[in-house]
Amino acid sequence: MNHTPSPHMTEAAKSGAGLLCGLGLGPDRVRSPDSLTHTPSPSGGTPSSSPPLLLSPGLGCDGIGDWESREELRLRELEEARARAAQMEKTMRWWSDCTANWREKWSKVRAERNRARDEVRQLRQRLDALTKELTGARRERQELAAENEQLRLEAQRVRAEQSSPENASTAPESISSTASTHSNQPREAEIKQDNQDEEGVRDGPGSPEQEPVRDIGTDKLYKQKEMELLEALLRAKSEAPDSWDGRSASSLRSALSRQDRNRLLWEDLAALEEDTSKLNALQLRLDESQKVLLKEREDKHALIKNIEKLEAELSQWKLKYEELNKSKQEALKQLNLLKEVHQDELGRMSEDLEDELGARTNMDKKLAELRTEMERLQVENAAEWGRRERLETEKLALERENKKLRTQMEDLEEQLARKRRQAASALDTDLKTIQSELFERNKELADLRHVHSKVKKQYQEKMAELTHANRRVEQHEAEVKKLRLRVEELKKELGQAEDELDEAHNQTRKLQRSLDEQVEQSENLQVQLEHLQSRLRRQQNPGLFGKMRTSASSRFGPEDADGPPSDPDEDEEEELQLQIP
């Protein structure tokens, strides 16, 4: 039986030969189907000691059905694997989109937080600068108050010198008293106004609306008193010569000498000039102090407006901080939801991995079964090969016997012809015997031919079985190759899934770290905001300054009273430290 193999089947036979070589069969035992045409004939000589293993490309009906069912199963598994891969790609894309959205949100929140931190830092710097300016203004106001007190004492001393019992008369005393009253009234008004301003500053931003009304009224009173003071000074200057004339007349009426009168006159004139120069200097200093007080009032109003602006900005920042807290809570809720979804996805992925591992174990079991079946087929093939060798030897023996019988028949025919020529009479009897012998020989030859045909049929059946076994072996080899490729693909997909799972874990860790950093930064902002609120409360408490002064006066003895004035902010901080346990 000669088969014409196709090139595809020859390639399959070559791959099967490589597989059989790997299983322990040598290349001399593997031949293509076209090698059957070169099998030795009985007349060509004896066969080789290593018989070929025939790999026929044909397939049986059972093999075709199994192959189609397995192919359908493989296609179904391939479609399921593709669907799982597409689902995993979708989930990973969704995760990447979610992480990108979260990164954008966190970047926006971080930018807003940095912006808020910068604005809070700027507000803090402005607040520090304003507090420094306020402390400087308080010090200058205290210094001006001390200077005003000194000027008032000097004016009182000048008035006391003018109203001395030696040289004073009733008119100058009345003028000086009116002038002193007029000069003391605006100073007392200034001192009251300063005290009211200090109380207004201590009251803080809680009462900024009453300040302008009080300042307008006091400015009007202050201007009226200033005009009255200037009129009194002009009257005193105009009435001074008349009073001195009265004094000279009274002195002339006395029993003093002219030299004494001249000396007293010159002394009075010198004292008057000194008093006028002192009054002018005091008036200039008073004008300067008034200008400084006006500037201080303007600075105070500007500071109050700045404090109101800062409070408005602080309220806005509080609202922004509350919004940030709300957005942070929403982000935490969304993050928890994402964590739950991620845990569900991880559970599904773990289930898929377990399914893949189960499929892999099933594939390993199938491979083990195929290996055992292949080994069984190899054993059967070896047994069939032994049977074939035995049949071939029997065939060769029968052919030799046929040759011997043919030679014997030829010899018998020659003897028969010779006997026919030698004796005609004996031919009949001999012919009968020879015919009987020939009939027996022909019968034996027919039996031998019948046996030969049976053996040949058995040989053909065994060859067909062998070709079928070779086809099944080729089919199993192709299935083994496909299964190996499938196992490699599954290994690659498993490695990719593990890498994607590790990336997802790393992304969740990064998100958790960024969340912890945001929480720490929000806590730092909360601490800074509480510190600012405590400082604003310290500035808004008006009763603390009185407590500080009393504590400072009780802390320092009478010998320290003449020392430099202490900083109210430092005293305030010390008082707060004493009050807070």
Curated annotation (Swiss-Prot):
The keyword Cell division does not apply. It comes from the Eukaryota. GO terms for cellular component: myosin complex. Residues 1-61, 156-219, 496-517, 534-581 are annotated as: Disordered. InterPro entries: Myosin_tail. The keyword Coiled coil applies. Gene3D superfamilies: 1.10.287.1490. Residues 161-184 have a biased composition (Polar residues). Residues 559-581 have a biased composition (Acidic residues). Residues 39-59 have a biased composition (Low complexity). Residues 185-202 have a biased composition (Basic and acidic residues). Keywords: Coiled coil. Residues 70-164, 270-541 form a coiled coil. This is Coiled-coil domain-containing protein 102A.
